[in-house]
Amino acid sequence: MSSTAFTSSLSNWDLYPTNGSITPHLLLVGAQILFLSGPHFHGRRTLAATTILSLAAIAQYNRFTNNPGVANLFALAWPHWLSAVEKIVFASPEGPEADLWRVDRVPREAMSWPVFGWRKVKWAVTLLLNLRGIRWSFQVKNVPKMPERMTRGQFLRWRLGELVWVLLMTDLVSQMMLRFFFTDAAGALGNLDSKYITIRDARWGWSLLKALTFGLGPYFFINMQYLVVSILAVAMGISRPEVGSCPPRRSNRQPC
């Protein structure tokens, strides 16, 4: 049976078979760190772009899990590997090490570090996680200055409190989504075909509540991921605790 015929034969609630491997996904992560923390050499741009883009394409054809939590981690990896390609391909002739540094450190600090050493690996990982370049030489515009600082302990206590709040709200929104979008008219949970999912309702109040629930789901899930990353990064010393670093258009609860 061809791939197209097989796909069309699936109903909306059927899951694709997990006949792939997690290896390309892990290699994709490793390749980004490898090329950023490795030496600068002729052909680095071409080799890095070819390797990362090839692994990204191969990873798309390797379904290794139907667990939404695990799959979500790798499904959201695309901005990170795109960022790695951009920073290497469009770097100056001396490489990204000459362009990217933390504003409170010595400029071009990574150029003096041993390749694949701990400091350069940590620099590469921090660079990949900090997509908006907060406190880096490539920081995005319109980030407000926040002179107030927190100690590591204060920051971790504050963020852990935020994480508890977000986890509670995530659980509440998840239960609301199950009730609104995955429960049929008879009250059976999980039997509703996804093609019938809609925020429309004959009663405008319920329609508004469904739309709010649909929007709050990604909001709290993404906030939860940012909080966990910020807690781990500060706890391990990869990042420094900062009170504020987000543009005003985003919630002040969301770490960067």
From Swiss-Prot:
Keywords recorded for this protein, A-Z: Glycoprotein, Membrane, Transmembrane, Transmembrane helix
Chain coiled-coil ranges: none
Transmembrane segment boundaries: 21-41, 163-183, 214-234
Gene Ontology cellular component list: membrane
Protein's membrane topology: Multi-pass membrane protein
Principal place of residence: membrane
Pathway noted in the entry: Mycotoxin biosynthesis
Glycosylation sites: N19
Location of the protein in the cell: Membrane
Record's function text: Part of the gene cluster that mediates the biosynthesis of aspirochlorine (or antibiotic A30641), an unusual halogenated spiro compound with distinctive antifungal properties due to selective inhibition of protein biosynthesis, and which is also active against bacteria, viruses, and murine tumor cells. The non-ribosomal peptide synthetase (NRPS) aclP is responsible the formation of the diketopiperazine (DKP) core from the condensation of 2 phenylalanine residues.
Name the UniProt record assigns to this protein: Aspirochlorine biosynthesis protein F
Source species: Aspergillus oryzae (strain ATCC 42149 / RIB 40) (Yellow koji mold)
Gene: aclF
